[in-house]
């Protein structure tokens, strides 16, 4: 029982892995702080749920959501955690190694640690300084560092780029 609790609590640490490819190098070494009005742990199904006014911080990373659920596969066969954040909207911000801030928001954010795919769904937006991408769905492959933005037939993907912000400094 004690071992299951310890294993389940380590799920919390996985929540911010989705942003580690973008964050300051030392962000992932910082403590993870999670506050919420309610927290629950389902040991049998390996699910940790944080609900109502969820605030997560780690270094320069700040995530706000209405509900965050972390699911660890029941088998020990090397399966990876899946994370889902819901909000109106879910918001996140962080500072990159180049000193530029990045902000994002969506109704739902999913991250699969196994495939290393981050999916923002529902009025999704990624913004860096004044440049931004708006779409119904934004998918980011963390390993390949590739992004796909798409809409479901209604409307179009919108991108705003400022040439001065694209230049390396």
Residue ranges of predicted features:
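Mature-chain termini and adjacent capping regions
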Residues: 1-169
């Amino acid at each position: 029982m004690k071992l299951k609790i310890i294993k389940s609590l380590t799920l919390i640490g996985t929540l911010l892995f989705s942003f580690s490819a973008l964050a300051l190098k030392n962000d992932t070494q910082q403590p993870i702080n999670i506050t919420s009005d309610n927290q629950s742990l389902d040991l049998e199904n390996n699910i940790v749920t944080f609900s109502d006014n969820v605030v997560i911080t780690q270094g320069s990373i700040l995530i706000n959501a209405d509900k965050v659920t972390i699911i660890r596969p029941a088998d020990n066969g090397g399966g990876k955690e899946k994370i889902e954040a819901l909000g109106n909207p879910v918001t996140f911000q962080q500072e990159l190694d180049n000193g530029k801030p990045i902000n994002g928001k969506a109704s739902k954010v999913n991250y699969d640690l196994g495939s290393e795919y981050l999916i923002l769904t529902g009025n999704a937006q990624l913004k860096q300084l004044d440049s931004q991408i708006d779409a119904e769905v934004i998918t980011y492959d963390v390993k390949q560092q590739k992004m796909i933005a798409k809409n479901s037939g209604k409307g179009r993907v919108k991108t705003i780029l400022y040439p001065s912000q694209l230049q390396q400094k």
